[in-house]
């Protein structure tokens, strides 16, 4: 995954 990628955003 690229830097700063998140599978979810809270």
Curated annotation (Swiss-Prot):
Question: Could you tell me the superkingdom of the organism this chain comes from?
Answer: Eukaryota
Major localization listed first in the record, in broad terms: secreted
Identify the tissues in which this protein is expressed.
Answer: Expressed by the skin glands.
What is one process in the GO biological process aspect for this record? vasodilation
Asked if the keyword Secreted belongs to this entry, the reply reads: yes
Tell me the GO molecular function terms.
toxin activity
Keyword check for Secreted, yes or no.
Answer: yes
What keywords are assigned to this protein? Amphibian defense peptide, G-protein coupled receptor impairing toxin, Secreted, Toxin, Vasoactive, Vasodilator
- Where is this protein found? Secreted
Q: Which GO terms describe its cellular component?
A: extracellular region
Query: What this chain does, per the record?
Result: Produces in vitro relaxation of rat arterial smooth muscle and constriction of intestinal smooth muscle. May target bradykinin receptors (BDKRB).
* Entry similarity comment: Belongs to the bradykinin-related peptide family.
Q: What is the designated name of this protein? A: [Ala1,Thr6]-bradykinyl-Ser
């Amino acid at each position: 995954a690229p830097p700063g990628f998140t599978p979810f955003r809270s």
